[in-house]
Amino acid sequence: MFHMSTIETDGFISDQAVEGRAIFRDRFSDIFALAEDMNRVAVLKIGEAKLADIDNGLFILFLLTIRIIESYEAIIILMERGMLAPAKLIIRPLLEAMFTLAALVKDKDLITKYFDAQDITRQIQPRSA
């Protein structure tokens, strides 16, 4: 016998919360349709990229684009479940990645500076035991 888990016992990973997805999608159908259309375009574009065509300097642009798409999809998934606060937490790093990507596209010399900054950050962070 199947026992449907409830929000009271299993929170947002419950069967009941999954069923609530239809309610949110119906209530905000225009927004979800637009979000999915935008996501579809982004996924198709990134799918057209060929790793063999990406030289080392531009590889970071490819990776940042993937990170942006994944963050965008995470926001959609969280919003479907009515998890507004966690979705909002992802917006800032998504925007930071978008601004970084735009800056790197405009000035390819920033790619080297970006890697240098990442190296410095790793050196400063305390190492776990």
Mark where each language-model region is.
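N-terminal, Lys/Arg-enriched amphipathic/low-complexity engagement segments
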Residues: F2-L64, I69
